[in-house]
Amino acid sequence: MMLDAIRWDTDLIRRYDLAGPRYTSYPTAVQFDGQVGTFDLFHALRDSRKALRPLSLYVHVPFCANICYYCACNKVITKDRGRALPYLQRLEQEIQLIACHLDPAQKVEQLHFGGGTPTFLSHDELRQLMAQLRKSFNLLDDDSGDYGIEIDPREADWSTMGLLRELGFNRVSIGLQDLDPAVQRAVNRLQSLEETRAVIDAARTLQFRSINIDLIYGLPRQTPENFARTVDEVINLQPDRLSVFNYAHLPERFMPQRRINSDELPTPAQKLEMLQSTIEQLTQAGYRYIGMDHFALPDDELAIAQEESILQRNFQGYTTHGHCDLIGLGVSAISQIGDLYCQNSSDLNQYQNTLASAQLATSRGLLCNADDRLRRAVIQQLICNFSLEFAEIEHAFNIDFQGYFGELWPQLQGMAEDGLIELDNERITVLPAGRLLVRSVCMVFDAYLEQHNRQRFSRVI
């Protein structure tokens, strides 16, 4: 059986609603609190240094010149390019403060610039930021690392792409969302297919290793027909990876979303139709379903890692670098170092002012206990490999699986009867009909979801 086999079952999807955590971490960021601070971070960095663990760096650039109404990211909308300078000064301080607690022998296997719009920065600013990172951390200079950056095609031309390649980036992620002009107007992101194609042509010519495109379904004025056209156009661009996100309309939490007319949003039935059609189109075009909104061509390293059962998941999404300690730099950035999760202040002024006084801007986080570590491993296995061998967990954590999770058995048996999973005394296998619903299976093992929440998340009969 092909690993990417997934079966569409509308009845199951309606019963096991898709709402729930995306499990880029366990425990999820909802559990972070202010008890965790810089002292914990220094402690974790010391452990990382002693173990000489490899690193994955995430750098957050919060600025955007224009607002996209659907966006739920931490961002600052400004046309004033001068806003970047004071931020970069503080970011450089943070880089220095963190790096002095680590060993130069710790290789940076993965680097990702996200935002906001990283290409909001001028060429000189990008050069200087990368120079600071190279000075402070052990960046690989043989192009063997996974060094990626998020690109807004409206902000990037050939010279920008050339600069990024020269600075060591070898992966790009392109926000596209939808190509239909009516949808683009409704979300205030006007971006032509030509602009996107130009960036992709540049990336290919400059030998970037991997191109990812992001799409969103469920946006205002989208219909199954016009979204299918967007997907066809995107398939023609042949990205190595695709992310197809479900738009979550939460105007009470995200101010820009209040400018979206909720009457123009597609119905839940239309959204399901879009997702089903997208999966069919991408599968026919040779893409593998990796899980949780992600697709990749079979020769992409995510697909290969999944075949070899070494895929992992962290705040950067699916990754082949889950063994690295993740260091988040910049406003709102999250780090995962050993058993510590910690997040910088999400308020730009607070972030800048704290660093101005030579203090790190850690504002909240969480230290995993033994139960968290065990459940984290279970959820990782399910969400990355669609299977879980009890013996592996028993061996790693010195427990009896069925004894430890006995109270969950009735729920798991219910899922087995419904055809989401196969369950026996040795393993859980997520079946093709359950793969789109893998987060519902993970939620069974989430100790932080209240019982009533769990019901609300899973079954919407």
Predicted regions and their residues:
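C-terminal scaffold of the Radical SAM
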Residues: 47, 77-100, 107-402, 456, ...
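Flexible, acidic/Gly-rich N-terminal and inter-domain linker regions that tether
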Residues: 1-55, 104
